[in-house]
Amino acid sequence: MSFLHLAIVLPFIVALLIPLFYRWTKQVHTGWLVLPIPVILFIYFLTFIPKTMDGATIVSMPWIPRLGINFTVVVDGLSLLFALLITGIGSLVTFYSIYYLGKKKERLSNFYTFLFIFMTAMLGVVLSDNLIVLYLFWELTSISSFLLIGYWYHRERSRYGARKSMMITVFGGLMMLGGFILLHIMSDSFSIREIISNADVISNNSLFIPAMILILLGAFTKSAQVPFHIWLPDAMEAPTPVSAYLHSATMVKAGIYIVARFTPLFASSGVWFWTVSLVGITTLFWGSLNATKKNDLKAILAYSTISQLGLIMALLGVGAASLHFDTLSDDIYVMAIVAAVFHLFNHATFKGSLFMMVGIVDHETGTRDIRRLGGLMRIMPITATIAFIGTFAMAGIPPFNGFLSKEMFFESMVNITQLQLFDASTWGVLLPVVAWVASVFTFVYSMIIFFKTFTGKVKPYLLPKKPHEAPFGLLLPPIILSIFVVGIGLFPNLIAEPILEPAVRAIVPGLSTDFSIHISLWHGFTPALLMTFGVVALGIVLFLTHKYWKPWITTKVPKALRIGKTYDNGMYYLEQGSYRMTMFIMTGWLRTYLNYMLSAFILMMASVMIFTQALDFNFSSMTKVTVVDFVLAAVILVTLVGIVFSKSRITSIILLGAMGYTISIFFVISRAPDLALTQLIIETISVVLYLLVFYHLPQFSNIEEKPKWLSMKTFLSIGVGVIITLVSLSAYNTTFYDSISKYYVDNAYVEAAGRNIVNVILVDFRGFDTMFETAVLSIAAIGIYAMIKLRLTKRGENDENE
């Protein structure tokens, strides 16, 4: 295992150890013990920056090589950017949680176990080159996020939010798995690099579009794109450190990563271009609009996250057009990819600081409701400064980093009208219009967060706690992120060459060697800057009149667009349908369950034999049936009929024993004396046990059965018998593989020094099978003995009490 593989699994290993050392270190906050892990990983991944500027680092470890499944790790510009965000933000969140979560009140071992499992899952997603390994880590993110969102499981809303996120993201994951399988069918490889290298061949396959749609479903569900965005607002029931980590920099960016990673493969299709662009721009608009009507600070940030994710998704969709040009060094559509990568980084910084700021406000005032907040700037000046930087960066105001990437976003949306592909020059005019309107709402909700929380009058009578400034431990992580927001805004080229360029090259492999990124705070009077002026002007008007139009958009949204209600209704009817089906199937009668199982067996086996044409029998090669065989078969048939229609238990037992002894004669004729002896012993013991047990049972009563049950029993009995007979004949006449009998004959004496082949098979070749069967029987015997002994003990106690 390489250091890269160890870096991925290290948080998971630590997560497994946390419950062990937690009980011995309760005097120390668990966060202090685990904090070095993400810090060390962040420093480790920083060392890859020079390497990714020269190319990707690839390390592979065999896992299931025969199936083409290897744990291959690739560190290129894109995966490194995400790895730095995962470990960097993870370090700050871990530090923040030490002061946010009380040592005595919270289940810290659970929290950090779930958090570090999630960290491993995210690192695995962004660093894995193998599709199957990526999918396993992908689903681990869903499971660990479910545990984190439902951390306060005693709250009904937390459980609801956790279930909702799990249902939607796991659904998307399964769809994405289907897309991965289709890619494997088309390319005969699970390696993402190999699949992308064969993009020209794969794009002509009939499975290309279905694979694309399935993979996009997985990406859209994870990154909360419309209409799958409904899980993210309910996920805000998680503790604020979880929201700051999962819902600003990591989990919700996983879908963005998938779209960016597969852009070189699918960008040739107009379906990819329009689907990603339109879903992204729709999500941008819908998220920003809904954020303006919320009163909970976390809810506003949730919808703002949805909106910002849509912005990045739209940029990736527009940027896909860049792969259609031969000369990419000065292609204007490459700048859309640059803007997407840049805003992905910027969003993690300002949104992470804002989530932490909201956590501080909630922690120190006891509420997140903006109707109860106000005037906190005088009481919490440092927190107010953090909020000012974060909200103005999110609104796209200079000199913060959000302004730069927002300008690049506007420029990319305007340039799409010049694209002579996919009819973008006509329909593409809608994208800059919607983008501008959505940006106006983005400005409005950003101002709502800051001004309605920190300006105006303090309302102490509405606050559960007396507000005060947070301790330095809570303030330090958002301060660090705010420094990045300002620093990158003033000096954006600090990250342009070492981080942004390698990431863009990973998404657009055909970039020329002289391609470089240069970002400046002042770039002249451009259409993008004029759009920003318009956003600010109209945004101020809408903010000042917010109380007048907010009720209108709150009440006038058509019911058809309330997707959350549709989800709730769907889950309700699904649960009701499942309950009714369960009540129909689970009758409590053993015969009902047997009927279901036997009916399914008959239908499945009959269907398989018919569709595989397995009913072609050759009787000429079979052993000839003698008179003795006929007599023995007749005896077995007579005893079976007698057992079925017998009115006496004793008679049934005797007939059952007679049938077993007759079968042993078959073994003697077939020259299998060991089997015959075993059969005789088993039959004798069985008859004796039956007689002993039946002696203690109540008197046999003949229950009159309804004709329909008798008919069902008859049909199933005959059906199973016929199917077993046909399967036996088919298996005898159909040989897909060479018989293994010759292997046992040749090796029984040589390998095991045994002349009795049956004994050698049971004891040597299938020794483990025999041993475990013996173990199962022993466990069953112990269970029966314990039940009998417990019953006798209770009976003795009762007698003694009497």
Segments from the language model and where they lie:
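Hydrophobic alpha-helical elements at and bordering transmembrane segments
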Residues: 73, 345-347, 373, 589, ...
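...captures the hydrophobic TM-helix bundle architecture rather than a specific catalytic motif
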Residues: 1-497, 520-550, 575, 592-612, ...
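Membrane-embedded alpha-helical segments of integral membrane proteins
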Residues: 1-2, 672-687
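Conserved thiamine diphosphate
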Residues: 669-670, 693
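Conserved RecA-like P-loop NTPase helicase motor core
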Residues: 654, 681-685, 690-694
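Membrane-interface junctions at the ends of membrane-embedded or membrane-associated helices
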Residues: 696, 700-701
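C-terminal transmembrane helix pair
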Residues: 687-692, 704, 708, 754-756, ...
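Aromatic-capped, Gly/Pro-kinked transmembrane alpha-helices
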Residues: 495-534, 540-654, 658, 662-667, ...
